[in-house]
Amino acid sequence: MVRLFGTDGVRGVANIDLTAEQALSLASAAVEVLAGPNRTSGPSGRGKPVVVVGRDTRPSGEFLEAAVVAGLAASGADVARIGVAPTPAVAHAVAASGAMFGVMLSASHNPMPDNGIKLFAAGGLKLPDEVEDAIERRMALPPSRRPVGADVGRVRDEPVLLDRYAAHLLATLPVPLDGLRVVVDCAQGAASTLAPRVLRAAGADVVALHADGDGIAINDGSGATHLDSLRAAVVAHGADVGIAHDGDADRCLAVDATGEVVDGDQILAMCALALAERGELVDDTVVVTVMSNLGFHHAMREAGITVVTTPVGDRYVLETMRAGGYVLGGEQSGHVVFLDHATTGDGLLTALRILGRVAETGQPLGELTKAMTRLPQVLVNVRGVDRTQVDTNEELLRAVALAKAELGDEGRVLLRSSGTEPLVRVMVEAGTDAAARAVAQRLAAVVRTALPPAR
């Protein structure tokens, strides 16, 4: 049986892969598992459990929100609905309000027809795999009880939780952003209103791009996965920095004043060095995934900073950070976790840390990113093959071993199946772009021929 939860919650085409019925069932099962049998008592032992619910701007978010709220309230949970909000705002609201758990409706960077459900446990942390599995099993069973009368949940709108999140973000800034001109691309998503508001409150001169909150156009040629319009806008407006969020604003990429892209690895390198300089980088350690550029590893080694590597997914980065007590980690894609200020990847917080560093040093972003040199990296996505055999197919394993031997210490090869899409990713790094591209294309061809078609 295919697991319902992927690496970042439940995701698929809304109304086909993810229906209102499934959303209601999942919400009800989550209350059963996370609140337990005594659902008239919340975490403090007083009153019903409270669940925070937020969504991005996708049209399908409206009916999915209605279904989730119905499932929660019918199962005896009170609902604090915060409306359109970044994913990390839901996590913060759960932690700050003492809610039992939180639900975010978003498919992040995926196209508009998709949607998804992410759950946050008490304290604002993403759920462990075993808890997600328990919820999935519970979905197959009838409800253990149906509250009636005063025991059913009540629903209220709580926009004040977003205001508190914004205030929390602003409190993390080391210095005001006065004098900085910033272009922020909100991808027509969850940060469309909040990101420009927070940056202006911090003192920046803000140009807002793709910030109408038009969910029909979410991630369409905009945001963290489509940086061309941001690059052009930064140059056209003479901005100091460009900031790009994805649909749910849990990640952030940047653009320097010349229009050059600054990826998650460069952001992490810059922030790691800043924290180490202040003596705030716990154990001089940063946590990244296997996708981080080899150039990042080289830069950290030269700075005396230890790098701990995890599987792909900010949830695994976070688990490793919590286990080791580390304060900084993230992904090349722009999910960055500052564990001393957040419980999950936070695009708005990351933007403020980038801009704060520019403001306090007086150095251009392009100068700060020279902390590391990226090795050429080529990523090829192979669709239509059985991704479950990536780690077991002998022909493919031999091809990977040969490629690694060819590149030696000056390059890297990584093959993995996507946790959110039906594809296999082939990633190669090498001393030159041509070498990386040649090896990647060769391995992609082996993937297509060695692996059977997807079922």
UniProtKB/Swiss-Prot annotation:
| Top-level enzyme category | isomerase
Tell me which InterPro entries the record gives.
Answer: A-D-PHexomutase_a/b/a-I, A-D-PHexomutase_a/b/a-I/II/III, A-D-PHexomutase_a/b/a-II, A-D-PHexomutase_a/b/a-III, A-D-PHexomutase_C, A-D-PHexomutase_C_sf, A-D-PHexomutase_CS, Alpha-D-phosphohexomutase_SF
- Cellular-component GO terms for this entry: cytosol
Entry comment on modification after translation = Activated by phosphorylation.
Listed GO biological process terms: carbohydrate metabolic process; peptidoglycan biosynthetic process; UDP-N-acetylglucosamine biosynthetic process
Identification of the protein by name: Phosphoglucosamine mutase
EC number in record: 5.4.2.10
Which family, according to UniProt?
Belongs to the phosphohexose mutase family.
Q: Which Pfam families match?
A: PGM_PMM_I (PF02878), PGM_PMM_II (PF02879), PGM_PMM_III (PF02880), PGM_PMM_IV (PF00408)
Q: Would I find Metal-binding among this entry's keywords? A: yes
Bound cofactor: record note? Binds 1 Mg(2+) ion per subunit.
For this UniProt entry, the molecular function terms from Gene Ontology, in alphabetical order, are:
magnesium ion binding; phosphoglucosamine mutase activity; phosphomannomutase activity
Q: Report keywords, A-Z.
A: Isomerase, Magnesium, Metal-binding, Phosphoprotein
**What does it catalyze?**
alpha-D-glucosamine 1-phosphate = D-glucosamine 6-phosphate
Record-annotated membrane-spanning stretches: none
Q: Which PROSITE patterns match?
A: PGM_PMM (PS00710)
